[in-house]
Amino acid sequence: MRRRDVMKLGALLLLDACTQRPADPPSGQVAVAPGLTLVMPSPASLNRRIEVSQLVVARYRTQTIAFEARISAAQDHFDLLCIDTLGREAMGIHWTSNGILAKKAPWVPENLRPENMLADIVMLYWPEAVVAGALAPSGGTLVAEPGIRSIRLRDKEVIHAEFQPPPGADPWNGKVRYRNLPLDYALDIQSRVLAP
């Protein structure tokens, strides 16, 4: 092979390596921050039946969007329906022990992944022991204090959540401010339980 051909081949291999995105985590896991995955628990591990309405304001860098979410959860399923401010169905998610089924409107950005929406909900509202166990395989830890959840990787906070219901109150009733520091997004969520 001539030197010129070797250089072309090397350049093509380098270009290919630079344009490939990181591998997706193994099945059943969701990347929630660089180097941190959440092993998705079962919907049953929420350990309650609940119907919730939420108003969500999401901020990503300079963009802000608002939407309404309706949640229905029981031992055998977790359903999430997202509706935009014009009343259009943006996304529907049905999660069971068999997996996640999602339907997105064509205008919803491709990088808005149902698995990540569910992972955010799990990290906010699932029992502390379940969240801690789901983060542990990738080295993540949960530090929980009254009104605060902090998720850390190698002693550095990567996710921070502040709950505004009174300490001891149901976190599904009230406000929460959630920040994913390395991915540079924040969620302000106002929740109201419709049926326990």
Task: Give the ranges of each region predicted by the language model.
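N-terminal export leaders
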Residues: 3-7
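Bacterial Sec signal peptide processing site at the extreme N-terminus
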Residues: 18-32
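A short, Trp-centered hydrophobic/proline-enriched beta-strand micro-motif
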Residues: 43-60
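N-terminal beta-strand/beta-hairpin edge segment
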Residues: 55-86, 95
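A mature extracytoplasmic/lumenal domain signature
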Residues: 82-86, 95-99, 104-107, 191-193
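Acidic/charged, solvent-exposed loop-and-adjacent secondary-structure segments enriched in E/D, K/R, S/T
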Residues: 101-130
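Gly/Pro-enriched, hydrophobic low-complexity segments
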Residues: 139-196
